[in-house]
Each structure stands twice: as C-alpha cells, then as structure tokens.
Amino acid sequence: MSSIAYEQLYHLDVASLKAAADRWNDVARRYRQWGEGFGDGVVKPFDQAGWTSIDGTAVLARAQVAAAEKEFGDADTEAKGLRAVLEDAYEELRRYKADLHQLAADAPRNGVRISGTGEVSLIDPDEDGDQRRGPGGVIPSQNEETILRWQTRIALILTAAANADQSAAIALKHNTGKGGDEGFNDRTVKSVDQDESQRAALLLKKYERGDKLSPAELAELDRLMDHNQKDPEFSRMLLEDLGPEGTLRLAEDLEHERAGDGRDKDKYNSVQHALANTVATANRDKEFSDEWREDMRELGVRRTGDDGSRPYGYQTLTTLLKHGDTAGYPPRFTMGLTDDIIAAEKKHPDLWNEYDQANAGADVDPVPVMDPVDDMLGIMSRDPDTATAYLDPGDDGGNERLKYLLDQRDWPDLEVREVYRGQEPTGTVDHIDASNTRVGLGSVLEAATTGEEPGPPHTAGQARIMRDTVGLLDTPPGHEEIQPNLRRPLANCLADYTDDTHEILSGVQGSYTHEAPQEHGRGGDGLFGRENDAHMSPGSDKLIRLMRGVSEDPEAYGTMHKAETAYIAKQMEDTGGTTADSVREPVRKGGAALGAYDAVREDVVYDKRDDANAQEDWKAKTVYHVAGTPVTMVPGIGDAAQRILDAWTYDVSNEEKGYNNDAAAAEVADRSLQSQREMQFLVDEWANGPGMPGMDDPDVNDLQLDMRNDHTTGEKLANDAIGR
C-alpha cells in the first residue's frame, strides 16, 4: 500500500478534489445534453425516415445509431461514477486532514511538540521519566511511552488516509473501464464503498470456495476489510453480496484458520476480526438488521453443512462475533440476536448439547460446548449499559430474562450414554456440566450489576439485578451450591455492593431491614434509594447463603473478605472522630459483619472435613488472595483508612510468607482471618494513629469488648442462615 507523509496530508489541497468532482458533474451534464441533442437530431429523424433495405444496410445503420446513442448515456454514467468516487475521496481525506490538524493543535497543551514532518518530541521532558523500566530495561520509560502514544495516533491517521487514497485510485481506475473499442464504461460504481465491497466479496467468495488466495490478494483483502469494517454502507453491501449462508460458511472457514497454524494465520485472523465488526456495523441499520435476523432465525437452527458434526448457524455466528470489537456492537443488535437464540432453543431443546458414550463406571472429563446464548452474554458484558438494560427486571418485574438465565434455562451440557463393553447401551444417560458453562453469564452479571466504574453509587437497574440475583440463586440451608464458573464473578458483584452487604450483615441499619419508600418502583421490596443512587436490601439469610456458595472458591472468598475489611477501615475514617465513642458504630457493625464471614469460612472448612488436604489447600489459597487482592471496589478510601488497611494486609502477608507449605499457611488463615483478631488489629491501628487515644485507652478496651459481642451476633445470624 502506498503511504502518505505527515506534511503531505497536513498541507493537502482537498479543495482541488472537490473542484474536480464538481467539474465531472459538469462533464456529466454536457454528455447528457449532447445525448439529448443526438437523440433529437439523429435518432428521431432516422427512425421517422422509415429506411429499409434488402441487403441489411438499414439494420446495420440503425445498430450504429443506437450504439452511438448508448455511448452518450455510458459517458454520462462514467462521469457520474468518477464524480462519486472523487466526492468520497474528498470527504474522507478532508476528515483525516482535520483529524491531523486537531492532533497538532492538541499536542502543545499536552506537553508535546510535533514538527512539520511529524516528528514527535516533548516540550519539557521530565528527567525522572527517562528511566526505562522492567528487567533489563525492556519496558519503555514514561517519556518514551508518551512519545510512542502520539506517534501511534499520527500513524493511525496517516494509514487511514493512505487507505482512502488507494481505495479512490482503484475505484477511479475501475470506473474508467477498459476504454478503446469498448467505449465508455456503463458498469461504474456509485461510491468507493460499492467498489470495495464488490472486490472484497469476490476475494472472500474465492477463499470460501477453497481456492487459495495469492499473497497479494490476501493482503488486499486484509486492507479492504480493515479499512471498511466500521463503514455502514460497505458493511451492508458486503453482507448482501455474500448472503447469510455465505457469511456463515465463511465464518466457519475463518475459525478453522484460527485453530490451525498456517503461514497466513495472522492475516486471516485479521480478516475474521474485521468480518465480525462488519456484521455488527451492518446491523446498525434497523431495516437491514430486521431482514438479516429474520434470515438467521431459519439458518441459526440448521447446521452449516451436511455433516452432522458441523455447528449450527447460531453457533457459527456467535463464535465469529466474539472476535470483533464487542464493546462497540449496537445494543439493539446484541439484545435482539440473544432473544432470537433463546426463542430458538425454547422451540428446539438440547440443540446445543454435546454427546458422547462411555463404558459403565468410566470417568468422563468435562468438555466445552458451543453455547451461542452464553457467547452473546459474554459479548454484551463488554458494554455494561447494554448488559444492565438486557437483564434489568424493571420496576414491574416484567423483564424475565434474568429469571430465565438463572432459574429456568436448561444449560447445554455433555450428554454421556453409558454402554457395556463399548457396544451395548445400558440405558443410563449422564449429564456433565460443560467446562465453559455460564462463563458469559458470569461476565454479564458482573457488568450489569457494577457498571463501568467500581463501587457505588449504583443505578436502580443495577441494584434490581443484584437483588434479584441474590433471590434467584437462593437455596435451602445446607445446600448452598453455586456453579463454579459463577463464583468469582458473583464475588466481584458482592464486593462491589459492600456498602450494602456490610449493613445487611450488621443488621442494624433500618433502611435495610424495614420497608423504605423509593422513587423507582416496588418500594421496600429489597430495594431503596434514588434512580442513580440505589441500594439492594435482600434478606440477610439469602445473602449469606449466596456468600457461602460463592466461597467454595478461595479467591472468591478472598475478594469479598478484603472488600469488607477495606469498607470497615473507610467507615472508621469517615467518622472523623478521635475518641473510641466516635468509631463505636462502625466497629460494632464491622464485628457483626466479619462474624458472618467467620461462619461462612468455617462452614466451607467443615464441609471439607473428610479431606485434610482440601481443607489446607482452601485455607492457604484464601489467605493468599485476601492478602494479595487489590482494593478497587471500595472507592474513596482516604489516607487514614489506607494506613489501617495496609498495616493489616502487611501483617497477614508477612505471616503467610513465613511458611512454605499449605498446612502452615492454613494455620495463618485460621489465626489472621479470625474476625475478632482482625477487628482488634484494625481498632488498635486506628487508636495508635496520629492524634488518637492509643490502644491502651480504657474506652478503646471497652470498644473491643462491644465488638466481640457484636461478632457473636453476626456469626449466629450467619450460622442460622446456612443451617449450622
């Protein structure tokens, strides 16, 4: 591909392109006028003369007159095509020139100088920012990173401009036709997009037929797709040319390239990425999307080939879509397509299952399944606002998507038919959870309940989803089971709502324990607050049982515990007081909340009582994650709270580092994570801070006693909830 230098684009005379396009408009008008004159002055008189001849001379003459008349029309068509291409080139290059000028204007305000030839330097470089980082200095310095960032922005604009220039040049060449005896071109394209979509479609169809693309053809295809993947007109025309079935066959072939190790794998992966974006871009148009999805409703439940092992259309489509820039997909498309797939699986149960057979008593390992619904949920998780809109039950509870996914859906699995001696079926069929089951669901739940930024405030929609998730996943005491792939995402969700879970577990905040009016529906029903500052308040028993199920994963438990500790430290700091009485409420609430964590942790350990290694492994991993988890879900932590939290984290990690086996680390967990010891440590750190009364103050000692009483209350509350 040809390149454009910085100074060429910066000083490009785009007005000349506009003037050229306007002149071609004049040319087209003149050809039309000449054609009309030829028709009036030659064609009509010739036809009116009624000339006939035996030797065919009249027929030949009439054909020549008609050919001449057609040339005037073709000349008009060619001129219009050239004008259209020049107008497209003008619009694109004008935009890229403006982008470059804006970048140059922004640079000085950011301490960056861009020379007339595009060289980037810092106006006043920070001497401390010159040090390269990482082992052996392999990571660029901060100053180098700044320069690289601006160089990259310039390069992206220049590359896009060069693409536009090359695209226009090729389209102009196509529009002029072959010339010579063939005359003017009557098959011109009406835009650069049309020309490029036709060329891309030809190359893609050639590849899909199994014909090998030459290096030049593959490079051109990669350029065409990369340059146009976010262009609505190109995308619609390309998909219309390929057709829905052709698109699916192509998507399957490209996925095979990804799984292989061919020499051109990276280029085909780039084409696959662009094709995914092209599908999403085309579906921004409502009329196109409605028709395209209608076709997919039929193709989605059919296999993409005659082979019974080939995937279904929806499986192929969602696999393709995962490889695009999913965060930018249009919400109407992602939500609508997900609903289409759910409607299909309700009509065709077990459509996405995998099947196998095994001898009686043989162990069968879980395998991944191609679950298009879960794929789409994972895609939506990249756009938190869309995730929330999709799952929000609404003020009236009318949206039941969350209920379907958490409570009603028969998730695809591995169906294993038992056989005797490898042949005779025994009649026994086992269902084994897929290794990747609910991965997308976990991601979309986390996005939908937490939003873009960690921690509160939460919107009413986010809080509704969190509240209903707690309720829908509730189980009877003693049966707190959460599917493994949901545990960490749910722990992240709960950690994000620590301001709510803390109050619920402490059981003393009236807004969480009594009906409270609210402005966005169903007042007091597990939800209160304002539209953009809402709180979930499910029953403490349901919350505790969910925490217990999630805590089977030690990392999940560590995430929640660390968030709770950070929140307690923040609450102590937020009082602004310097006496024991000033922090009494946060300390007592903290004791109660951590008492509940004690009960949860002890129940997990108790359930592993028959396997000492499993107990030790869980404890060791828990203390590791509690000590190592960064606190991002509790915003607004000040210096005093951070000091308290850092001291406790250092104490835990210091003890943990002193042991080199799981058994010893488990002892650290028993000691360090026991909530009475933890709260005592936090209170002592607070009391020993600047201007504080000191840990030996009698009032501080009384506060520690109150905390222990509340710890017992919180622990009992949790034990009752989980049936201990």
Please tell me what each predicted stretch does.
Residues M1-G177, K212, G723-R724:
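N-terminal secretion-targeting helices of virulence/extracellular proteins
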Residues D181-A721:
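Non-catalytic all-alpha helical scaffold/repeat segments
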